[in-house]
Design a protein with these regions (language model features):
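Conserved positions within tetratricopeptide repeat
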Residues: 25, 29, 48, 68, ...
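Amphipathic alpha-helical dimerization/coiled-coil segments
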Residues: 11-36
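Generic alpha-helical segment signature
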Residues: 5, 21-24, 28, 93-96
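Generic alpha-helical secondary-structure signal
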Residues: 1-4, 50, 118
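Hydrophobic, amphipathic alpha-helical faces that serve as interaction scaffolds
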Residues: 4-20, 52-90, 126
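C-terminal all-alpha effector/ligand-binding and dimerization domain
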Residues: 29-32, 36, 41, 53, ...
Length: 149
């Protein structure tokens, strides 16, 4: 489900041709700033909430309510990905702002290719880390995000 969410976000970026409103960018900026204030592992639920709100901005930009409904129906899968990363929770807490700043900076370019590539990298970083933690070769992993821009 995690990589399906990534593909839905990429679809939204393509549908809006990489053009995000000033309001959406401002909202994403506020979320990233909120991410920077989280310092304690006890705030892990806020980390997940911020992540969902940030990525929801990407999905909502194209204006298709059904796309958002489909994407948000996978929230539980995203939550599981966060909690399955046990042992890396502190890393996520302390790096969430930096990780999402890259995506926001890409969004600000308005360039579909840059945004989509950054989203792929964003989602694959987590996926590759999970595979390595479980002794699975990335070459054996059958699900790749191969997106033509």
């Amino acid at each position: 489900m995690y990589l399906l969410r990534a593909n839905l976000e990429i679809l939204s970026v393509k549908m809006c041709d990489g053009k995000f409103s000033e309001q959406t960018i401002a909202k994403m900026e506020q979320i990233v700033q909120r991410m920077a204030t989280i310092e304690q592992l006890e705030q892990f639920d806020e980390v997940i909430e911020n992540d969902n709100q940030f990525h929801a901005c990407i999905i909502e930009e194209c204006g298709l309510k059904r796309l958002y409904t489909l994407w948000s129906s996978m929230d539980s899968g995203n939550t599981i990905v966060f909690y399955r990363g046990a042992g890396k929770n502190e890393y996520v807490v302390h790096n969430q702002e930096k990780i999402h700043r890259r995506v926001l900076d890409a969004v600000k370019t308005g360039d579909v290719q840059v945004i989509c590539k950054t989203l792929i990298d964003h989602y694959m970083e987590t996926t590759i880390g999970y595979l390595k933690d479980h002794g699975i070769s990335t070459e054996e992993f059958p699900y790749k995000i191969n997106v033509n821009f």
